[in-house]
């Protein structure tokens, strides 16, 4: 994790029993100035593993919905830019480069990231998103 005095980029993750995935997820996000995890009451080692990866971990077991957990992430984030990442997702080196370039050039306040669907290491070419909410 970048140890800048004032974080520019926070990567924020919501978790619940993600011990099998959280290290890989956070390892891909290690370039960020700040890693924040809001845990929803994991009963496995998710919190311990996230802390070992350098994340600031906050536990909220009173599940009030996905939106509330996101708001809690925002409340703990100090970065100028916040990137929401799901625990089963990874930031590729190419995406990392795009994120760093976008922040360095800072021509907008919001970016939408398009991603590839991958299963068992292979792209899912017959699957596409038809609609949804920007998040």
Regions found by a protein language model. Give the residues of each.
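Active-site nucleotide-sugar/metal-binding loop of Leloir-type enzymes
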Residues: 52, 71-81
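A conserved acidic beta->alpha catalytic loop
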Residues: 28, 39-51, 62, 86
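Conserved donor NDP-sugar-binding/catalytic core segment of glycosyltransferases
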Residues: 80, 90-125
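Acidic helix N-cap motif at the loop->helix transition within catalytic regions
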Residues: 20-23, 44-53, 94-95
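N-proximal low-complexity "stem/linker" segments adjacent to membrane-targeting elements
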Residues: 1-28
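Conserved catalytic loops of nucleotide-sugar-dependent glycosyltransferases that act on lipid-linked
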Residues: 124-135
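A short, glycine-/small-residue-rich helix N-cap motif at loop->alpha-helix starts
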Residues: 61-68, 74
